[in-house]
Design a protein with these regions (language model features):
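Active-site entrance/lid segments in N-terminal catalytic domains of soluble metabolic enzymes
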Residues: 1-203
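Conserved active-site-proximal phosphate/metal-binding subdomains
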Residues: 17, 167-211, 217-353
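Residue-level detector of alpha-helix initiation sites
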Residues: 25, 216-217
Length: 353
């Protein structure tokens, strides 16, 4: 039986974090269902307000309304079990506002990547209920963040998420590293990152749980991560093919129908490589740049005149089921997903129940 996951004074019965997926793939329904099973359900705040009536006119306002709404709803669905958190990308233009809204709404955890969350401790009071974690992909990034947090804020991470090269969405690796992924000894890197956290555990006299993500697919994968020294795992792609996932049926079927050969790496307007399902949208991009008629002000660094497509428009189209105009991010193992399931069944499978 897997041990429970402790983060601060909170306990998740199952050491499974459902990874945040945006836009609109992991919202309150999915996160609440995962938490209810005793795991950690994570809502993506990326353009989370896309269904709010204010969105077309004021995206920033709509997103803040939706952050609070979805955290509240997920907690209600969880019925006091597990934890409900948010994933907030550092690359977002309104990063600070998203963090403050999540804290105000009572998010149990904030997980932050797609950049280095150097200022996160400044935004989340250590005495608040909310616990914080950076996403890292290398020992170098882990040490850089933990060293900065210790020096500037006299504080360390409440937990850390290590995201490996098989993860979906935005990736903390170069295109060259991803192309040679099969020859990468990432287990050694995981051990190095865990070793790095021990230094800060000693300094701050607290345990820093380590969560491993990227390519975790089976119970055997979960156990392998635990054997490496992890306290838990983060799984994202497999939760797309659940009844509770917030995405459209067409989005889910894009996963079910994908083969290994359909998975590719593209350059995202975020400025990082991203893993996605090759579809009509991607094939169209290879022929010509998509015209951008409106900027949704989602990213801190994005020039509509130079990026090949609008990531907001593409991700919203996908989650609503428009696959010809939609970008479908996925993990490296999406080709192995071949049937629909439920959150309960998937969680039971992952923990070997």
């Amino acid at each position: 039986m897997l041990r429970e996951l402790r983060i601060g004074d909170m306990v998740a019965k199952l050491p499974i974090i459902q990874g945040g997926m945006g836009v609109g793939v992991s919202l309150s329904r999915l996160a609440g269902a995962v938490a209810k099973e005793g795991g950690v359900g994570v809502i993506s705040t990326a353009q989370i307000g896309f269904e709010e009536p204010e969105f077309e006119k004021d995206q920033a306002k709509a997103n803040l309304i939706a952050i609070k709404k979805h955290i509240k709803k997920a907690k209600e669905l969880a019925c006091g079990h597990g934890m409900v958190g948010v994933n907030i990308m550092v690359a977002l233009k309104h990063y600070k506002e998203h963090v403050l809204a999540a804290v105000e709404a009572g998010a149990d955890v904030i997980i932050s990547g797609a950049g280095l969350p150097m200022e996160l401790p400044e935004l989340v009071d250590e005495k608040s209920h909310t616990r914080i974690a950076p996403i890292v992909s290398s020992k170098r990034a882990a040490n850089l963040i933990l060293k900065m947090w210790a020096h500037r804020y006299n504080r360390t991470a409440d937990f850390i998420v290590i995201e490996g090269p098989k993860a979906g969405g935005h990736l903390g690796f170069s295109n060259e590293q991803l192309a040679d992924m099969e020859h990468m000894d990432y287990d050694s890197e995981i051990k190095e990152i865990i070793s790095c956290t021990k230094t800060y555990e000693e300094k701050f006299k607290k345990h820093i749980p380590v969560i491993v993500a990227g390519g975790v697919f089976t119970h055997e994968d979960v156990m392998h991560c635990m054997e490496l020294g992890a306290d838990g795992v983060q799984v994202a792609s497999r939760f797309v093919a659940t009844e509770e996932c917030d995405a459209s049926d067409a989005y889910k079927h894009a996963y079910l129908n994908a083969n290994e050969s359909d998975v590719q790496i593209i350059q995202s307007p975020v400025g990082m490589p991203g893993r996605d399902v090759r579809n009509g949208f991607i094939r169209g991009l290879e022929k010509k740049k998509q015209p951008i008629t409106k900027c949704y002000n989602c990213l801190e660094k994005c020039n509509p005149a130079t990026v090949p497509y609008c990531i907001t428009k593409a991700l919203i189209a996908a989650v609503k089921g428009d696959m010809q105009n939609g970008l479908v991010f996925c993990g490296a193992n999406v080709g192995r997903i071949n049937r629909m399931t439920t959150v309960h069944e998937l969680m039971s499978e992952l923990v070997g129940a």
